[in-house]
């Protein structure tokens, strides 16, 4: 492996030189940071190491071409000390004074066990030479290691092959310097293997950037005729680190497929773009795993997201029969339904542009290029149009007699019956059968609403980071979910953000803040959330590398239009050889919709709820050809089918639960759906 070593005029660069040479088997090529970047033969190198040095990364004299190496080379980069600080600063972090100067001083470094720290004990001893430190890392940079004084000692970019260490691994006083260099070598080689895999794939991804950003609903109406199967994964609320992109597409491409699966049959049914249907008897997750491997296409380096086309759809709750549950109830809808998308439009709400993605077989790209050209012209035309004002939701709602939970709407369990089931949950908890039971109720009503206008109303009422509109032949799914089930990177990084704990928004700023503070501090809500955090940690620990699962954020309050929510974040890294489908299978259904212990609690739920949940409380999103995935929990979601609307509501029952409060919480959670359907707030259930 050939390595370029950029010397920031440091006195330890050739100590790094030796460690790099030992790890790679070849001496690196050393160039000073004031070399001519344009004359460097980057095609001759496999990786770059940016050395320590004096000064600050924001000064040209101190950092020079190190900046270009990080931002422009496209190669795996390891930044050491000053190089580490440069990565942080170039992606929006802050570099300022460290708590105290640390020159030639030894610290213990604690780490996650990932990437450059793979296989190393935590803590280990390292030597530090720095007065500055990286702080306030942006979400695209992930800290991997820390010293006891709280300074970030290691980081990585979530999408690019960039790593940094603040300490000096080459120092004679540092432990495991050679191992860190060997780990970087392995990461660089793995990156290049993934790129070479693209040449082996039977498919080729074509990408075009269009520097306009039309209104998302205008794109849905103007680019997708609405026939067949369509999807709109909608970041109607753009939150840093959670939602930046929306994706739209349909089944008109030459490689598109629409597949459904029902647990009772055990058969995957696939309708191709030519109208023919094939049926395969195979467990769903096994089928999905095989197809993703067969069709694997590495992430395009010029895309700022990991969705490079693939499967878009939902996993219904009753699919639990193929993970950790029993086939107690049969859903009227497919237990899984996905569109294999070979064309998609991505809206970048942060940069104000679009990306067009088209997949074709190698050597047969005329259709893809024509679609890119035509769609770019359509988007440019849509960008000059003023988006229409959303039509009030009540125009499309259920008949007036069914307003709220009126006489034409039917809850599976009325208030008295639901309260009795809460009491049953409390008895099961008192008897030691469960710690937490996520009890839910299903509500149905006749409706004349159609999917797109109704979803337009729902997204206006409740903008969220994980919204979605799936218009499939059997049903339409309209989701205003605020909850991330799992996001899985092509590099194996995993994140889950379960929600447990809800309060309504207040009528005044003072009341709103009081409700928010009550949610943040109430023991009952924290207990609910904590138990699900531990459950999700357990699920991820079954498929993640030892020591990689951690909780960077615990009990954070997130605020949305209708409610405040208590959210925690769990992260990990998949064990080598573990597929994306295997990770989802290990965690499905999401613990925030079951309770704990999961298997026994789902048995209790099956008995008390007396019917299927269907799409509700499953998962919705995409599995990409890159090996990445992003799935939300299906909550705050309306399902339209056969002239009826249905949605689920519920809450976690714990020993501290109050029955009336739990019922009221279901009413609060229903507000967005009911308001979209009939234009009025929920007054109560009958």
Curated annotation (Swiss-Prot):
- Which EC class does it fall in? transferase
Effect of a null allele: Disruption of the gene decreases sulfanilamide resistance and blocks chloramphenicol production.
InterPro entries the UniProt entry points to? ADC_synth_comp_1 (IPR005802), ADC_synthase (IPR005801), Anth_synth_I-like (IPR019999), Anth_synth_I_N (IPR006805), Chorismate_C (IPR015890), Class_I_gatase-like (IPR029062), GATASE (IPR017926), TrpG/PapA_dom (IPR006221)
EC nos? 2.6.1.85
Which Cys-Cys disulfides exist here?
A: none
Domain (Glutamine amidotransferase type-1) spans 2-194
Q: In which pathway does it act?
A: Antibiotic biosynthesis
Query: Which purpose does this protein serve, as stated in its record?
Result: Involved in chloramphenicol biosynthesis. Catalyzes the biosynthesis of 4-amino-4-deoxychorismate (ADC) from chorismate and glutamine.
**Family the entry assigns:** In the C-terminal section; belongs to the anthranilate synthase component I family.
Tell me the protein's name.
Answer: Aminodeoxychorismate synthase
| Gene that specifies this protein | cmlB
């Amino acid at each position: 492996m050939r390595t370029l070593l950029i010397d920031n005029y440091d006195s330890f660069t050739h100590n790094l030189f030796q460690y790099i040479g030992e790890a790679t088997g070849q001496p690196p090529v050393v160039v000073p940071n004031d070399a001519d970047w344009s004359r460097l033969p980057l095609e001759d190198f496999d990786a770059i190491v940016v050395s320590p040095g004096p000064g600050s990364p924001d000064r040209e004299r101190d950092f020079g071409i190190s900046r270009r190496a990080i931002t422009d080379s496209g190669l795996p980069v390891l930044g050491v000390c000053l190089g580490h600080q440069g990565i942080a600063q170039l992606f929006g972090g802050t570099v300022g004074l460290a708590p105290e100067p640390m020159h030639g001083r030894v610290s213990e470094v604690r780490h996650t066990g990932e990437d450059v720290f793979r296989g190393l004990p935590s803590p280990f001893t390292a030597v530090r030479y720095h007065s500055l430190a990286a702080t306030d890392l942006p979400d695209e940079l992930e800290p991997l290691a820390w010293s006891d004084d709280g300074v970030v000692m290691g980081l990585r970019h979530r999408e690019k092959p960039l790593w940094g260490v603040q300490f000096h691994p080459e120092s004679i006083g540092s432990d495991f310097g050679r191992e860190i260099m060997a780990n970087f070598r392995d990461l660089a080689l793995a990156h290049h293997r993934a790129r070479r895999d693209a040449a082996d794939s039977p498919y080729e991804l074509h990408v075009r950037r269009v520097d306009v950003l039309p209104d998302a609903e205008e794109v849905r109406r103007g680019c997708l005729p609405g026939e067949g199967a369509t999807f709109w994964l909608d970041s109607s609320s753009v939150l840093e680190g959670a939602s930046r992109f929306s994706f739209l597409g349909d089944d008109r491409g030459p490689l598109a497929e629409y597949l459904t699966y029902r647990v009772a049959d055990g058969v995957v049914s696939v309708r191709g773009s030519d109208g023919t249907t094939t049926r395969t008897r195979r467990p769903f997750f096994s089928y999905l795993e095989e197809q993703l491997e067969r069709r694997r296409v590495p992430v395009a380096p010029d895309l700022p997201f990991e969705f490079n086309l693939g499967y878009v759809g939902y996993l219904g709750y009753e699919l639990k029969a193929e993970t950790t549950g029993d086939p107690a109830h049969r859903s009227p809808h497919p237990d899984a339904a996905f569109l294999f998308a070979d064309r998609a439009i991505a809206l970048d709400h942060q940069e104000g542009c679009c990306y067009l993605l088209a997949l074709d077989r190698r050597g047969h790209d005329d259709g893809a290029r024509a679609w890119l050209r035509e769609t770019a012209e359509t988007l440019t035309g849509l960008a000059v149009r003023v988006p229409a004002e959303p039509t009030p939701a009540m125009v499309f709602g259920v008949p007036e007699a069914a307003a709220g939970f009126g006489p034409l709407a039917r809850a599976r369990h009325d208030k008295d019956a639901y309260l009795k089931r809460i009491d049953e949950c409390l008895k099961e908890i008192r008897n030691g059968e469960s710690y937490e039971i996520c009890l839910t109720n299903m509500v149905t009503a006749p409706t004349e609403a159609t999917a797109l206008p109704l979803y337009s109303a729902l997204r206006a009422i409740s903008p969220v980071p994980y919204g979605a509109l799936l218009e499939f032949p059997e049903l339409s799914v309209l989701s205003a979910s605020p909850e991330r089930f799992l996001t899985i990177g092509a590099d194996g990084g995993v994140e889950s953000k379960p929600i447990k704990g809800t309060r309504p928004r207040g009528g005044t700023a003072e009341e709103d803040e009081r409700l928010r503070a009550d949610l943040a501090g109430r023991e009952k809500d924290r207990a609910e959330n904590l138990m699900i955090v531990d459950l999700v940690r357990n699920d991820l620990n079954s498929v993640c590398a030892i020591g990689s699962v951690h909780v960077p954020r615990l009990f954070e309050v997130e605020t949305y239009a209708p409610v405040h929510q208590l959210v925690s974040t769990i992260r990990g890294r998949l064990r080598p050889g573990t597929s994306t489908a295997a990770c989802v299978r290990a965690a499905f259904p999401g613990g925030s919709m079951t309770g704990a212990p999961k298997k026994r609690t789902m048995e209790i739920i099956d008995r008390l709820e007396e019917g299927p949940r269907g799409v509700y409380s499953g998962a919705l999103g995409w599995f990409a050809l890159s090996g990445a995935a992003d799935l939300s929990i299906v909550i705050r979601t309306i399902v339209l089918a056969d002239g009826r609307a249905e949605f689920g509501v519920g809450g976690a029952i714990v020993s501290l639960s109050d029955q009336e409060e739990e019922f009221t919480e279901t009413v609060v959670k229903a507000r967005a759906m009911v308001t979209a359907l009939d234009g009025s707030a929920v007054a109560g259930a009958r």
